[in-house]
Amino acid sequence: MNILKKKVLVGMSGGVDSSVAAYLLKEQGYEVIGATMQIWQDDKEFIEREGGCCSLSAVADARRVANKIGIPFYVMNFKDAFKKNVIDYFVDEYMEGRTPNPCVACNKFIKFSSFLDKAMTLGIDYVATGHYAIIEKQNNRYIVRKSEDDKKDQTYALYNLTQFQLERTLMPCGRYKKSEIREIAKKIGLRVHNKKDSQEICFIPDNDHGKYIKNRFPSKVRQGNFVDKSGNVLGTHKGIVYYTIGQRKGLDIALGKPMYVVDINPFRNEVVLGNLDDLLNTELIAKDVNYIPFDNLKEPMEVEAKIRYSQIPSKAVITPMENDKVKVNFTEKQRAITKGQSVVFYKGDLLIGGGIIE
């Protein structure tokens, strides 16, 4: 392939990973264009926000990097798509007693959909990000493998990628360790080489999702009852959006023993509390399942699966069901299987796919 003429649009957040991704692709001979996705919603909030991946300083950092490595740079507006597919979804899920994963939604609907559409409209061949994952082509099919840096691997949030998207996506950081990426940034004189990684949800800098939803929809967030599994009232909660399955801290209720959120009932506006054993389970059903090495699961398959980002995958068997659903049976009990979160499947370092826990 003559990549000299191949153009790539790099999503630049102002952080070290996407900055080095742009540099590496330029070094490989691509014609690189940098872009920051404008997703912030109202200007006051945006101006006050500092250091997140969608703050003014992030745009300034990305622009400075683009100038330094000698590539054109643009700010592209994805405000409406982000509000609809990420923020509204995020709020709706919490209102329904589920715990959403906004990064999974953003990857699915914004970075590898709206952003890719924009690139193609502009006649650009590829999009690229600073994600830690490896995309390879094998037997006429694109596959995704875990990155070289186990601690930074981001495949958990990439299970929705389609063959169409994978064919047009580059992730050069996947073959490096984070320390090497920082070293490259330092070597080429990027000020962001020691910029700390953003941990929070980009549109909720203080990580208080309950407060965020309450501020926007005060009438929808109502107090209700904490109950036990038999329905006996234990106390008052401040609104179901403040809680997630497995939560123990911040319940503001003293019952003489550790209690955990074991269920949330949006219809009765109740938060069910129980003990640690009530949180342990070996089975779940997932919907909206996407597979990467193949189109559909035909028969039960042994995999390693994980139900949260930072977890080490556990042995499980996945069994196909109707309507793009899958049953997941773990060998060992899992703690706090949470509706709305993603379950993701692997075979060694190969990403098999994933879905949303029902």
UniProtKB/Swiss-Prot annotation:
GO molecular function, one term: tRNA-uridine 2-sulfurtransferase activity
Reactions catalysed according to its record: S-sulfanyl-L-cysteinyl-[protein] + uridine(34) in tRNA + AH2 + ATP = 2-thiouridine(34) in tRNA + L-cysteinyl-[protein] + A + AMP + diphosphate + H(+)
SUPFAM superfamilies for the chain: Adenine nucleotide alpha hydrolases-like
Region of interest (Interaction with tRNA), ranges: 152-154, 308-309
Top-rank taxon, per record: Bacteria
Active site: C106 (nucleophile), C202 (cysteine persulfide intermediate)
BP GO terms, sorted: tRNA wobble position uridine thiolation
Positions annotated to bind ATP: G11, M12, S13, G14, G15, V16, D17, S18, M37, G130
CDD domains assigned to the protein according to its UniProt record, in alphabetical order: MnmA_TRMU-like (cd01998)
GO cellular component: cytoplasm
Subcellular location(s) per record: Cytoplasm
Keywords: ATP-binding, Cytoplasm, Disulfide bond, Nucleotide-binding, RNA-binding, Transferase, tRNA processing, tRNA-binding
Role description: Catalyzes the 2-thiolation of uridine at the wobble position (U34) of tRNA, leading to the formation of s(2)U34.
NCBIfam families hit by this protein: PRK00143.1, trmU
Similarity annotation: Belongs to the MnmA/TRMU family.
Protein's name in the database: tRNA-specific 2-thiouridylase MnmA 2
